[in-house]
Curated annotation (Swiss-Prot):
<feature type="transmembrane region" description="Helical">
    <location>
        <begin position="221"/>
        <end position="241"/>
    </location>
</feature>
<comment type="similarity">
    <text>Belongs to the SLC35G solute transporter family.</text>
</comment>
<feature type="domain" description="EamA 2">
    <location>
        <begin position="272"/>
        <end position="325"/>
    </location>
</feature>
<feature type="transmembrane region" description="Helical">
    <location>
        <begin position="190"/>
        <end position="210"/>
    </location>
</feature>
<feature type="transmembrane region" description="Helical">
    <location>
        <begin position="250"/>
        <end position="270"/>
    </location>
</feature>
<feature type="transmembrane region" description="Helical">
    <location>
        <begin position="67"/>
        <end position="87"/>
    </location>
</feature>
<dbReference type="GO" id="GO:0016020">
    <property type="term" value="C:membrane"/>
</dbReference>
<feature type="transmembrane region" description="Helical">
    <location>
        <begin position="160"/>
        <end position="180"/>
    </location>
</feature>
<feature type="domain" description="EamA 1">
    <location>
        <begin position="49"/>
        <end position="174"/>
    </location>
</feature>
<feature type="region of interest" description="Disordered">
    <location>
        <begin position="1"/>
        <end position="21"/>
    </location>
</feature>
<keyword id="KW-0472">Membrane</keyword>
<feature type="transmembrane region" description="Helical">
    <location>
        <begin position="37"/>
        <end position="57"/>
    </location>
</feature>
<dbReference type="InterPro" id="IPR000620">
    <property type="entry name" value="EamA_dom"/>
</dbReference>
<keyword id="KW-0677">Repeat</keyword>
<feature type="transmembrane region" description="Helical">
    <location>
        <begin position="305"/>
        <end position="325"/>
    </location>
</feature>
<dbReference type="Pfam" id="PF00892">
    <property type="entry name" value="EamA"/>
</dbReference>
<protein>
    <recommendedName>
        <fullName>Solute carrier family 35 member G5</fullName>
    </recommendedName>
</protein>
Amino acid sequence: MAGSHPYFNLPDSTHPSPPSAPPSLRWCQRCQPSDATNGLLVALLGGGLPAGFVGPLSRMAYQASNLPSLELLICRCLFHLPIALPLKLRGDPLLGPPDIRGRACFCALLNVLSIGCAYSAVQVVPAGNAATVRKGSSTVCSAILTLCLESQGLSGYDWCGLLGSILGLIIIVGPGLWTLQEGTMGVYTALGYVQAFLGGLALSLGLLVYRSLHFPSCLPTVAFLFGLVGLLGFVPGLFVLQTPVLPSDLLSWSCVGAVGILALVSFTCVGYAVTKAHPALVCAVLHSEVVVALILQYYVLHETVAPFDITGAGIVLGSIAIITARNLSCERTGKVEE
């Protein structure tokens, strides 16, 4: 009878049976990644990997022409302003809907502060260590804030991957914190680590505020506001706190252009990913930035990479694999049960 056939689930056997899907199609449907997995993959490939180049390239620009951090940040903000064109063509308000315009501007401000702290820290702290502290603090703060404000918990595998990535970061940066030089140089280095930590805190707050924004053009609006707020805040600060420098060599201009493009790609991908997956997991996957920065730190900047750095980077990569594999396996299980 039709009711006993495994492909039928109709109460009346007189109804026509639905056509069965080919085995290959059913297999593809079962193995289709979930939204969370898609978000984590976008954060890994489009957010973490390009961002890993930003710190070393910023340091190269500083070493080549003493380019101030605020000037580099201003150049990066300029790459966000052309986003106003597609917003205008679609008829969307540049600053967002009036009822949530304040939150959108606050989200952009938090992102500007986070990037500003990161750029300042990388001038006095090795690029890999600065990225390590910033990403570690953003992960911890995101987990705590999301748990307290959104009551969104994590599974055991997620916590395992999250804590493993934080352990890897501690292994990377821990020995350097215990060997800070005494005197003025040691103070500057310590302040660099503090700035990196504050940058991670601002990043986690910015991600949570961004998740609370719900309107169609949310991502391009926040990206445009990032450029606008950055220019309004840091152009005066550049002339007050630092001395503007006009790069005269091709290397500096190339680094500035690459930083602007890669940072814009990373910003967009992270904004997409955080709407699909838990903010703490997104921040944990973004730890791939640290691994890329360490590789460039050794091969391009010719700075020392200790065995602790290699060990910590391996643990970070393993933790990212656990988080991604767990989300993919959950989606497969859910499709099979259906």
